[in-house]
Amino acid sequence: MKLFKFVLLCLFLISPAKADTIYELIKIPNLEIYNIKTENKLRYLNAKQAFTIGIDNNINCFKSSKQDLDKKYKIIEKNLNRYSQNFLKKINLKYIVMCEDLSISGINTAGIPDNIMKTLIVDIKFNDRYFERVLHHEVFHIINDSFKDIFNQQIWSSFNPKEFNYAECSTCTKKIGLETYSKTAGFITEYSRSTASEDMAEVFSHLMYGNLPATVDPI
């Protein structure tokens, strides 16, 4: 009986300790470990309760059911296993946070990358039609944020028609469509027209996911 009580006490003490450790690492509360034994050493975490983060507390995400987590985890892992441990270390990505109904300032989003905290938050309820592709889109933002000198937005923008201008930010425009154009006219999706960084991310995601249009424009 004493042994049983001791085990219960240990479990009670260890669980909060793990949660506190996770918070100290990535500054996101209410998380628990989903899987940390992966090929490329990515740590998968999930929301055990809704959480709110950000300087202005403007980022929100909610707990998912185990059934939904199990289903989407397989898809996420399959796609992110394309990136080696060495590559992920170079770009500073270590933690994948799974939750649903992810939003920033009230605007729903597929993912929120943070190369400083080595974290990518993923909305597992994002549109299934684009879900796998947007995983690579968000990974590109991690790459871009880690190597801004390589991905020069001015050089990228110079390939566009002179009369075209990107929006000041991705949320400053209504160009949010993710459907792949059959006729690209210099852009692969409507969202590509929003900002240079989103344009790069859309091209990268199509290359990684393997669904480039049948014909693309010459540079």
Model regions and ranges:
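Active-site-flanking segments in enzyme catalytic domains
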Residues: 92-219
